[in-house]
């Protein structure tokens, strides 16, 4: 995030400098009369027509990314969070995801295709309020667990560079893996270097690119250094990061993997075994044999039932006895009964993990902690998807012209629904690939245009342009209103 602040300043300043303004008319479509900017424009204009191919490549990759990282991932977070409430509505988790996915996709469609600006304004008002509530809730939890903070920070650092379990490798390998995840999730959080945010900042009403760049560099600090750090520490101080909860295990689901304990206690990924024998709920495997894992953590016991609510370990019913066949994704009991789902203690991940942390951390004050996360996820995810639809349609216009906007938005809505029902690991994997493909041309352009960036900055500071902005604001405040005149 610290490095991203400099990157964000650079790309936004360049985008403001090289942006295009399309003049619309009263009879024209809504998307005309707007500003278009972003890396594709400063690549083409700043580096010259010989680099047009890279601008096209960037726009194409960012348009694909808008379907995934900024859309499918967001929908997946919402459905993954709300699927925990499937029992309340008498639905299985997947059906709940389908229902929620359809609702989210419908909301996004109404906003980006129907152009209902009131919903956009509502989100613009509510989202900052929810952000404040989320941060306040996190700060309250940390204050209530202040004595645990030093140990929490120590745990974060220790597990990052010398983990007890969960990933493969040691030494330099584990450092690289830690750095990769940090960069991936940091970029996902603040978009620094990705080239998406400059598209939005290009539309800002200012004649000073540097002033907009300064505003933009605050974003990585706020949403990553502050919000993400609060989230991470809340997860650690409440202890949920290392806890298991009763879980409905889809034996062929996207959260399933197989792990085997290697040297130094590190858990590594392995191909699934042919079968796993389970006696009285406990898997009987030899040392070095891959074991069933959920969210990358080994599941120690399996049950065929779980009482209504399925909230605590005491709710588990009837330990499973039989054989699990990973290739088929089914478990066959000794009496011949086939199960596609079993129950067992498993770790949480993603938004449900954060939800669990807030629920536990704020439990002394009431049972509404998890609700903060649910509402925050719902509002943030939908507003983020709507924002990314704008990024993508600017790319579509750059590549194909205005006629491509409506087809693009149709595909965007479809991808929103598909992302909501796809396995979490799959959505993230594809999103990370697309994310990497847009970063490369953008960073090349930023480095190549660093001289021009310095020229823009020197001009701004030599003119002391910020003083003019202050004077203009002061004159605006002192000017008589129409009523006074």
Question: Model regions: which residues?
Answer:
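Membrane-interface loop-to-helix entry segments
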Residues: 58, 75-82, 96-104, 108-157, ...
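A generic transmembrane alpha-helix motif of multi-pass inner-membrane proteins
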Residues: 164, 173, 177-180, 405-406, ...
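Selective recognition of specific alpha-helical transmembrane segments in multi-pass small-molecule
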Residues: 3-7, 101-116, 127-147, 210-239, ...
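Transmembrane helix-loop junctions in multi-pass membrane proteins
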Residues: 68-79, 108-120, 140-152, 233-245, ...
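Helix-loop-helix module between adjacent transmembrane segments
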Residues: 2-35, 39-40, 44-76, 80-111, ...
């Amino acid at each position: 995030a610290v490095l991203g602040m400099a990157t964000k300043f650079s790309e936004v300043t360049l985008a403001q400098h090289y942006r295009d303004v399309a003049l619309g008319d009263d009879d024209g479509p809504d998307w005309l009369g707007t500003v278009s900017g972003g890396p594709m424009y400063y690549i083409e204009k700043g580096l010259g027509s010989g680099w047009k191919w890279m601008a096209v490549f960037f726009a194409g990759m960012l348009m694909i990314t808008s379907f995934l990282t900024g859309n499918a991932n967001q929908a997946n977070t919402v459905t993954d969070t709300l699927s925990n409430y499937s029992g309340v509505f008498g639905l299985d988790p997947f059906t709940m995801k389908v229902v929620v996915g359809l609702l989210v996709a419908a909301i996004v469609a109404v906003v980006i295709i129907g152009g209902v600006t009131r919903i956009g304004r509502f989100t613009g008002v509510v989202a900052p309020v929810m952000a404040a509530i989320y941060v306040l809730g996190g700060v309250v939890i940390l204050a209530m667990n202040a004595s645990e903070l030093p140990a929490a920070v120590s745990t974060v650092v220790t597990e990052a560079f010398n983990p007890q379990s969960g990933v493969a490798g040691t030494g330099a390998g584990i450092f690289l893996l830690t750095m990769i995840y940090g960069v991936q999730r940091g970029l996902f959080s603040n978009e620094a270097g990705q080239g998406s945010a400059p598209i939005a900042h290009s539309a800002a009403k200012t004649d000073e690119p540097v002033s907009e760049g300064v505003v933009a560099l605050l974003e990585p600090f706020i949403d990553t250094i502050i919000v993400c750090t609060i989230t991470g520490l809340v997860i650690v101080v409440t202890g949920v990061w290392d806890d298991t909860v009763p879980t409905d295990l889809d034996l062929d689901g996207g959260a399933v993997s197989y792990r085997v304990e290697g040297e130094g206690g590190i858990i590594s990924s392995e191909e699934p075994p042919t079968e796993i024998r389970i006696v009285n709920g406990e898997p009987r495997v030899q040392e070095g044999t891959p074991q069933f894992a959920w969210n990358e953590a080994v599941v120690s016991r399996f049950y065929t039932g779980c009482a209504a609510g399925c909230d605590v370990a005491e709710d588990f019913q009837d330990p499973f006895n039989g054989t699990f066949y990973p290739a088929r994704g089914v478990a066959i009991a000794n009496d011949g009964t086939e199960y596609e789902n079993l129950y067992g203690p498993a770790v949480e991940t993603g938004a449900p993990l954060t939800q669990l942390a807030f629920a536990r951390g704020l439990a002394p004050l009431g049972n509404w902690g998890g609700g903060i996360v649910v509402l925050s996820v719902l509002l943030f995810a939908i507003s983020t998807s709507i924002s990314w639809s704008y990024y993508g349609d600017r790319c579509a216009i750059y590549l194909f012209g205005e006629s491509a906007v409506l087809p693009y938005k149709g595909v965007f809505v479809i991808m929103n629904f598909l992302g909501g029902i796809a396995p979490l690991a799959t959505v993230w994997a594809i999103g990370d690939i697309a994310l990497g493909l847009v970063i490369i041309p953008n960073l090349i352009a930023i480095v190549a245009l660093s001289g021009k960036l310095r020229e823009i900055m020197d001009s701004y500071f030599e003119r002391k342009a910020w003083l003019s902005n202050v004077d203009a604001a002061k004159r605006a405040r002192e000017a008589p209103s129409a009523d006074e005149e």
